[in-house]
């Protein structure tokens, strides 16, 4: 028999009854039932109930065992007594009567238990992450993560993609988030950077003549943590393709993501054909460029209706005269809600920095749709009817309003849409609702600097005739601000999984694109000369995307925080409490790197 085990703790079944087995694992729990000890033995694969009584030579040793000790037991498999089976365990029909027990590893009193759903402070969980990972749910999340990555790899290979590995030590990027810098011992005063993404390398791979690239790529950015973003490092499914249109990228990526989500959906529905939503439409209908389509509510613009001469609600009319807009958020069935429902929404809007949410409640009176509420008296019946018609409202429904600059009105309306949908129970949560956001503006007006600037990705291809683009007058702001880019986001349940683009592979178009935004050729050469040089040597049309692996896993594990799907995450301050990183280094190490510290003075 093997030194430590003949079976794992999740393997035994009724067919093993009568067998002599050896198991090793952690003592999950010990229960003393008056001279009979029950030890739940746990390993990576599962849990088995083991039993020992005073008739066994192992009883004395078993009495000393405590939680989380690591032990080996030999014993015989037997059927559990009728009525004591545990249907929630794969091994729940059997138990092992212990004949021999060996302690392989003792455990001191633990700073946190490893069973149950008790929530412990983040600092404790991260400092003792190896204990936290023994907890069933977190352990399962990490295993699911590995299975998801395996599935992604398999599906990419089936789609004709080849896996590459790009450098981890590279040059610092002049754009984007802050780099993590690595000093060079051989080149004093110079630094490598950890890649924020393999963006330039994957494009260079296409220029090198490869066709379909992918990589489960580690990425490093010195930025603050969020619920859906780890500080420091994360992984993405990095993808690039040659000789493709935007639609080709969609057709390659959709089956991969749809297939992975269907494989791990646990019964949730998955969007079969991802809708394409133009950016402007998303901002109007959902108030955000990453809409949660599980919520059926659609925002509508009612600026024209509130501009009517007969409307006397001056708070909105004054905003409209100043260039603002009014957005309406429907609330189906909300007329039956108590006054507190409306008051809470108004209080919430004030907490968001808005003066409140005006609203109208619709009722039927004499066959007519009649509006009630604090602003209804300022809005004539014909305008109320027009608003109701545009928003698809009927008697028993309500509508809320958000007004201000287009950005502020859209932002508040988008948040209100989610809140109202949740409060009214309208959102269908048991699904993964995907969409593509397309047609991002190439440029935007920088109000602070009074000039045109890039709106999103400066390296994407303009969705504009190239000859006409090269001939554009930089002073023709109206035309330029109307240009769209071949940029796209993929969104699931209101979470942006990735941005992507068809790349600008033509140096002349790239130079013109930067010139329109006020960047001279010298700036372009200085910051991006290496990439420009490669583009001048025969670059194919190419494009790609990079869905975030951590966010995919977070969604499929139904976790609200990305920390719950990362093996050894940092805390919110980018500290590894378990390993003590970041840490000070020795003076000798600093001398070898020709580095002298100039630390800020500590405040008194």
UniProtKB/Swiss-Prot annotation:
This is Aspartate--tRNA(Asp/Asn) ligase. Residues 199-202 are annotated as: Aspartate. ATP binds at residues 221-223, 496, 548-551. Aspartyl-tRNA synthetase with relaxed tRNA specificity since it is able to aspartylate not only its cognate tRNA(Asp) but also tRNA(Asn). Reaction proceeds in two steps: L-aspartate is first activated by ATP to form Asp-AMP and then transferred to the acceptor end of tRNA(Asp/Asn). The gene is aspS. Pfam families: GAD (PF02938), tRNA-synt_2 (PF00152), tRNA_anti-codon (PF01336). Gene3D superfamilies: Bira Bifunctional Protein, Domain 2, GAD-like domain, Nucleic acid-binding proteins. Homodimer. It is an enzyme of class 6 (ligase). The record marks 33, 83 as: Important for tRNA non-discrimination. GO terms for biological process: aspartyl-tRNA aminoacylation. It catalyses: tRNA(Asx) + L-aspartate + ATP = L-aspartyl-tRNA(Asx) + AMP + diphosphate. It is found in: Cytoplasm. Belongs to the class-II aminoacyl-tRNA synthetase family. Type 1 subfamily. Its EC number is 6.1.1.23.
